[in-house]
Amino acid sequence: MYKRQVVKISGTKVIPVNPGKANVTITVAAGTRYAAASKTVTITVIPAKTSLRSVKSKTAKQATVTWKKAKSISGYQISYSQNSSMKKAKALTVKGSATRATLKKLVSKKKYYVRIRTYKVVSGKKYYSKWSSKKSVKIR
């Protein structure tokens, strides 16, 4: 089975390559004043986040969300709520390289908060980026 490279070691640096988990073992040779030691660290690499371009409500009970396109990802997850703390938020998943989505069945005359994050599927597991900053919109 081929394992995808998650990180690359370059001198004394660990460079993220792809989303996923990697075990990195650090080894120190024995010296005159200390014994040899090694430590294994698990590193989780997540995709880069994206940002919202705009959230607009031009028709009743709907909002159109547009965002900046991210590279090398499987899709996006949009979260929206009437509460600014995003409690009881609903989610919409958009696969592929789309840069726009429409939120439907919203309540008219109410303010909604929207945020977005990217995800990458690696070996059947989804790795999510951090959330973007929130934008708000009043629904027509």
Can you say where each PLM-predicted feature lies in the sequence?
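Extracytoplasmic soluble-region selector
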Residues: 3-47
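Short beta-strand/loop motifs in extracellular/secreted proteins, especially
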Residues: 5, 74-76, 112
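Hydrophobic loop/turn residues within beta-sheet-rich immunoglobulin-like superfamily modules
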Residues: 17-19, 70, 106
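Short, solvent-exposed loop/turn segments at the edges of extracellular beta-sandwich modules
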Residues: 29-34, 121-127
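Pro/Thr/Ser/Gly-rich low-complexity, intrinsically disordered linker/stalk tracts
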Residues: 46-72, 125-140
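Extracellular low-complexity, O-glycosylation-prone stalks/linkers
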Residues: 72-92
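Short S/T/G- and acidic-enriched coil/turn segments that sit immediately N-terminal to beta-strands
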Residues: 97-101
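Beta-strand-rich modules
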Residues: 103-124
